[in-house]
Structures are given as structure tokens and as C-alpha cells.
């Protein structure tokens, strides 16, 4: 029976028209999706079976009306499900392909279990070596059992011995050149009371003094006379003797080191570099002192770090071999004082590693995987003789300098060079007093020498980065160029102030003795001083021969007269030495930069009695002498080159050549003319007497 014949009430509540028969509306039970697709709807709430199967996000019921809904109305809040699913499938596939093709990346959060797979082996003579996870000794000795122990004991008995060869060290040859016993004792005490040990702390005084009675045999009738050395009791003693001799080189012999002592130290270093059976802490102490002695007493040209790089590489390798990168594990039962000394050795190895490698141009020898900077904590450095402020300063410097050096040597650089310099500038601003305290000698008495040590290395890196950027880009932004000028002037000011402040006038007839203050100055500023001097003059010469895109004219193109270098006060170069703000609207003038540099470095050449004594003392240090002589020679050549440039400009101007619009060919011709003029006016320099040459620049060799 057809239900359409039964009368229905209006669902709208409106009265039915009396003159016209109303249309009936059915109650809609199916969802909108099933009704539109003509599917059998289960009418389940809130989701029917058809919508569940298709994973639709919603199921729409329209009970109050039955007119059709468009796709837009039905799914206006719903994404295209099929398209979303396809996108998800493609993303999953892409991720799988990336994982298959990408280089393995090890997450820091998951600790590498191989790092704990190490073993410490103690040799027959007391030498220690920590072997890593790939060593056969680690794999065979990591979990020892009775049979392995028995094998080790039997091997000690049956192990073939090498043929004995005569020692090449000839230790007793040095006896004839030793000072008296009281002089050695006094020298060692002076070393521990002096400024060098004040920043080292790698051993203690009592241990070194005890070596004198044990190693140096005195005459029975004259206790002041050393007649023999006793090195038979302990394999470490050759390094103990080396430590004592290095202290004597620093405080007694100075640069007048006897050939027997020099030969012994050289032979000991060479033997250590080629030996794996002499791994002692004393060896590391010997290498540290040897490096310091090389820096102070080196006569092998101006410092470029090659003079001591082998010592530092061996020092770093020895630290790792002895387990100094994990002192709390391998030296658990040692006294706290011994642990502090070991931490300081590791402390200096890391510092000299990054400093030397940067000066050489290589990445650090010690990799990040072997380094845990969290050891630089107050808990680990509780000794009253160690200032934790210094420890934190070293920690922060190692963090930023190692990052910079590592990034520079990566195959692909992720950041711009200037970002490295900005990080270092931020480090300097955060960890040091206002820069004016280092560039103004008035404040120097309150400055910790350790601060100068770290600051000078930081300045060296910043100045070199800006220099590298200039070389690569050929044209720098105003702010980068001006900041480079600023750091060059700050750096030379720090170097000069350090030398002047730490110079203590010699007493009585000790003019030829190396003063402790200047020894310290060399340690503090040696890499920085030669870097800044060479960088300033290198940039100056490049400026003279159009290596930069911007031209420089030394004469007025309208009048043909020489342009006088402007006074630096007009650009306020002094303000550059008080902070890190630089002008960004205009380049600092080339002439003003050169004049200010001259004024700063010439302050130690000014004619007065104190400077005369200072330069006399400086002449006893070959490293300082050679660096300052390097500056004097560079200046003479630069002055001659400037003169040649001016004369060439005048000649070209007279010829009517438009010098404001140079082509590449014209630039090449111009440089050739400058060079010819320079060769002509500088030929007298090759025949001048050396002493006369330096004397005219107030530098009496």
C-alpha cells in the first residue's frame, strides 16, 4: 500500500493552503554522503559504516531537509582525503630515501658505547698508555681472566730483549756546564716565585727541589759542586733532568745555553718523538717547558709556530695516551694535588693546540670526540692556587676558538666568516674588562696577565678573519673594513702596552740578562705581534698597487701636489681604542690608519732614557728583536713604495692620462711604472750597514 495516500502534518508548522494540496516531505534517515552516492547507509551515529570504511572525518545527517548538498557544502571544512593520504605516502617514501642516501649522523643524546671500550696498560718501567676501542690490546685485555694474567706473567719472563745500544743522550756531559748546587736551587725557587709559573701550575716546587738531591751527586768535600748525575733508578728521570735543565734555561742560562745542555734537550725531545715506551706525566711537563723555552729563546727567524708545532703535537698525543682527557677515571686514586696538576697540563695542551694549529693553519690535533669541556668546573678546580675565573675564561675561549677553527677547515662552510668574528667579539665583550683597560696603560696595573694571554689570541683570530674576508671578497663592507682597522689598532696597542708595562729595569750590571717581565710578554703577545705587523704592511702594500677595487691617489689630481696625510684626530681614531663601535657610513681613511699605527708602535722607539733601557733589554730577546726589526724594514719599504707611487702619479698626470678612469690594462701599466720607480729609489737599502740602518730608526741592535 502506497503511504502517499495518507495525509501528513506539515513539518514546518505552517498552515496548509486551503485551496491547494501540499507536498509531503519524508524524514531523512541516511547521511548526506550515502544519499549523494546512492549507497546503503547503516544510519549509525555519529558515523555510519560507509563513512567509517572510507575514513571520512565526519558523517553529516540532514533530518530536517532533503534537498541535495554540493561537494563544496558537504566537505567545505574537510581536506581531500585521498590527496592527503597520497601526500603522506610520498613524505614517508622521501624520508626513507633520505635515510638511505644520507651520511650517518650520530645523535649526541645516544651515547656511543664504544667510547667506554678502553684499557690502561702499565709498562715494565712504569710507563702508562691508554688504548682505544680498535686496539688489539684493548680487545685482548679489556676483560682479563686467569689465563690472560698467567700469559702476561710468562711473557715478562720469555720476552726477547732488544740488543743494547749505547745511549746517545750523554747525560753526564752536561755536568761540566751546570751551575753550583745553590745556584740551581735558587734558580728553581725564583722560577716558582716568578710570573711564568704564576700562570702554569703544572707541577709543585717541593717535587722539583727534591730532584736536585736525588739526581745531582755532589762532591764529598765541596757540597756546592755537582760531579755526577744519577739516572739509573727510574726511567722517568731523564725527563726529570730535562725539566730541571729547562728551568735553568729559562732562569739561568737564558739564550746562552751551553752546547752540552742544548744537545741533551734536543736529543731527549727527538728520542721522545720516536718512542712509545716513555709515556710519563713528566714527559708532558718537559714538553710544556720546552715549548715555552722555544718561544722565549728561539733564534730561528720570526715566530710562525713551526718552531714548536712538533712539541705541541707530541704533547697532545701524550695527553690522550695518558688518559688526561678523563682524569677522574684513570687517576681516581691519585691525590687531589696531583689531579690538579694533571688538569692544568690538559688545560695548557688544549690551549696551545688550538693556538698553534690556528697559527700554522691546520685544525686542532685533539678532536672534539676526545674533549669534554665540562671538566672546566669549579668542582674540578678547587685548589687555592688556581683562580677559577681563569678556568672559566679558558673554557669559554676554547669553546669559541675550537668552533671557529673547526668550521674554517670543514669541506663545506655553513656560516659566513664574519659570523665567526662576531662570536669572538661577543666573547671578548662578555669576558673581559672594557677594551680601553687594555689599550690605555693607565689601567694596566689592574690587569691579570692571564687575561692578556687569552685576549691576544682572540684578537689574533678576529683580525685574521677580517683579513681573510678581504682577500676572498676583494671588496669589503664599510663596517667590516672599519672593524678590521679597529682590531689592528687595538691589537698593536695591547702588544706595546704589555711590553712597556712588564719591562722591569735590570739591576746593576745585569743588562744582558733576560728580564722576567719581557719573558712573560713574549708568552703573552708573541703570535699576535708578528701577525699584526705583517698584516698591516701587507694590506698597506696591497692598497698601493690597486689590489682593492677602490683607487687611492696620493697626490691631488687637480694640482699635482702631494696630499698630506690627514691627522688622525679628524677621524677620532682614539675612539676606536675605547670600545667596539665603528662608523658605518664612511670608510676610515688609509692615511689616518697608517699614521695611528705609526704613533702607537713608535711609542717604544721614542727617544727617552726608559725606552733606551727597554730597547736594550729587548735586544737580548731574539724573538722581540726580529719582530720589531721586521716592522722597521717593512716601514722603510712602505715609505719607499709610497714615494714611488707619488712620483709615478705625477708623471702620469703630466702626460694628461685620466687617472680617475683606469682600465685593467692601464692599471697593469701603472703598477709596472710604480715598481720600476721603487726599484730605483730603494737600491741603496741593499748596501746600507745593518747597525746603521736600525740606528737611524732609533733601534740600536
UniProtKB/Swiss-Prot annotation:
Q: Where is this region: Disordered?
A: 1-22
Top-level lineage group: Eukaryota
Q: Where in the cell is it found?
A: Cytoplasm; Nucleus
Task: Give one GO molecular function term.
Answer: zinc ion binding
Please give the biological process terms from Gene Ontology that the record holds.
cellular response to stress; DNA-templated transcription; positive regulation of transcription by RNA polymerase II
Location of the DNA-binding region in this protein: 31-59
Q: What is this protein called?
A: Transcription factor PDR8
Q: Which gene encodes it?
A: PDR8
Amino acid at each position: 500500500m502506497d503511504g502517499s495516500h495518507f495525509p501528513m502534518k506539515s513539518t514546518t508548522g505552517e498552515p496548509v493552503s486551503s485551496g491547494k494540496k501540499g507536498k509531503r516531505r519524508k524524514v531523512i534517515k541516511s547521511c548526506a554522503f550515502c544519499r549523494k552516492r546512492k549507497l546503503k547507509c547503516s544510519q549509525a551515529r555519529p558515523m555510519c559504516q560507509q563513512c567509517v570504511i572510507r575514513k571520512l572525518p565526519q558523517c553529516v545527517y540532514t533530518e530536517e531537509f532533503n534537498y541535495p548538498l554540493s561537494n563544496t557544502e558537504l566537505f567545505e571544512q574537510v581536506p581531500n582525503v585521498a590527496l592527503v593520504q597520497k601526500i603522506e605516502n610520498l613524505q614517508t617514501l622521501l624520508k626513507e630515501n633520505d635515510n638511505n642516501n644520507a651520511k650517518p649522523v650520530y645523535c649526541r643524546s645516544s651515547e656511543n658505547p664504544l667510547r667506554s671500550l678502553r684499557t690502561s696498560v702499565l709498562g715494565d718501567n712504569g710507563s702508562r698508555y691508554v688504548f682505544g676501542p680498535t686496539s688489539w690490546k684493548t680487545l685482548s685485555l679489556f676483560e682479563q681472566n686467569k689465563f690472560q694474567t698467567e700469559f702476561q706473567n710468562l711473557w715478562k719472563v720469555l720476552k726477547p730483549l732488544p740488543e743494547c745500544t749505547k745511549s746517545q743522550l750523554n747525560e753526564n756531559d752536561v755536568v761540566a756546564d751546570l751551575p753550583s748546587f745553590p745556584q740551581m736551587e735558587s734558580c728553581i725557587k725564583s722560577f716558582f716565585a716568578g710570573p711564568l709559573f704564576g700562570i702554569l701550575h703544572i707541577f709543585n716546587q717541593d717535587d722539583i727541589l727534591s730532584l736536585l738531591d736525588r739526581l745531582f751527586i755532589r762532591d764529598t768535600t765541596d757540597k756546592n759542586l755537582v760531579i755526577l748525575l744519577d739516572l739509573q733508578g727510574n726511567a722517568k728521570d731523564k725527563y726529570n733532568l730535562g725539566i730541571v735543565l729547562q728551568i735553568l734555561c729559562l732562569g739561568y742560562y737564558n739564550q746562552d745555553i751551553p752546547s752540552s745542555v742544548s744537545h741533551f734537550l734536543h736529543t731527549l725531545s727527538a728520542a721522545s718523538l720516536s718512542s712509545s715506551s716513555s709515556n710519563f706525566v713528566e714527559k708532558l711537563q718537559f714538553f710544556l717547558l720546552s715549548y715555552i723555552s722555544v718561544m722565549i729563546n728561539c733564534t730561528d727567524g720570526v715566530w710562525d709556530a713551526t718552531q714548536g708545532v712538533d712539541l705541541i703535537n707530541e704533547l697532545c698525543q701524550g695527553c690522550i695516551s695518558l688518559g688526561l682527557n678523563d682524569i677522574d677515571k684513570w687517576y681516581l686514586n691519585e691525590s687531589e694535588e696531583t689531579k690538579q696538576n694533571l688538569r692544568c697540563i690538559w688545560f695548557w695542551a688544549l690551549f696551545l693546540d688550538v693556538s698553534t694549529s690556528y697559527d700554522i693553519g691546520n685544525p686542532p690535533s685533539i678532536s672534539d670526540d676526545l674533549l669534554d669541556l665540562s671538566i672546566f668546573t669549579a668542582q674540578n678546580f678547587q685548589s687555592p692556587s688556581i683562580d677559577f675565573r681563569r678556568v672559566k675564561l679558558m673554557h669559554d675561549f676554547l669553546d669559541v676558538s675550537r668552533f671557529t677553527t673547526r668550521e674554517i677547515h670543514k669541506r663545506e662552510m655553513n656560516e659566513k666568516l664574519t659570523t665567526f668574528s662576531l662570536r669572538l667579539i661577543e666573547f671578548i665583550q662578555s669576558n673581559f674588562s672594557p677594551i680601553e683597560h687594555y689599550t690605555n696603560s693607565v689601567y694596566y696595573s689592574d690587569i691579570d696577565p692571564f687575561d692578556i694571554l687569552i685576549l691576544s689570541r682572540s684578537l689574533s683570530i678576529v683580525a685574521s678573519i677580517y683579513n681573510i674576508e678581504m682577500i676572498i671578497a676583494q671588496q669589503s663592507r664599510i663596517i667590516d673594513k672599519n672593524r678590521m682597522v679597529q682590531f689592528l689598532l687595538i691589537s698593536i696597542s695591547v702588544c706595546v702596552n704589555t711590553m712597556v708595562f712588564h719591562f722591569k729595569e735590570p739591576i746593576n750590571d745585569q743588562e744582558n740578562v733576560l728580564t722576567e717581565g719581557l719573558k712573560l710578554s713574549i708568552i703573552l703577545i708573541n703570535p699576535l705581534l708578528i701577525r699584526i705587523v705583517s698584516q698591516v704592511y701587507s694590506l698597506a702594500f696591497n692598497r698601493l698597487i690597486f689590489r682593492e677595487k677602490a683607487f687611492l691617489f696620493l697626490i691631488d689630481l687637480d694640482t699635482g701636489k702631494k696630499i698630506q696625510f690627514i691627522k688622525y684626530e679628524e677621524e677620532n681614531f682614539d675612539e676606536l681604542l675605547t670600545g667596539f663601535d665603528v662608523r658605518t657610513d664612511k670608510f676610515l681613511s688609509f692615511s689616518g690608519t697608517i699614521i695611528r699605527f705609526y704613533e702607537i708602535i713608535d711609542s717604544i722607539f721614542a727617544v727617552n732614557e726608559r725606552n733606551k733601557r727597554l730597547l736594550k733589554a729587548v735586544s737580548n730577546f731574539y724573538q722581540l728583536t726580529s719582530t720589531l726589526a721586521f716592522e722597521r724594514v717593512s716601514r722603510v719599504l712602505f715609505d719607499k713604495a709610497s714615494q714611488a707611487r707619488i712620483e709615478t702619479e705625477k708623471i702620469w698626470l703630466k702626460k694628461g692620462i685620466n687617472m680617475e678612469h683606469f682600465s685593467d690594462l692601464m692599471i697593469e701599466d701603472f703598477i709596472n711604472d710604480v715598481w720600476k720607480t721603487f726599484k730605483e729609489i730603494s737600491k741603496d737599502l741593499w748596501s746600507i750597514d745593518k747597525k746603521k740602518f736600525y740606528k737611524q730608526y732609533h733601534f740600536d741592535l
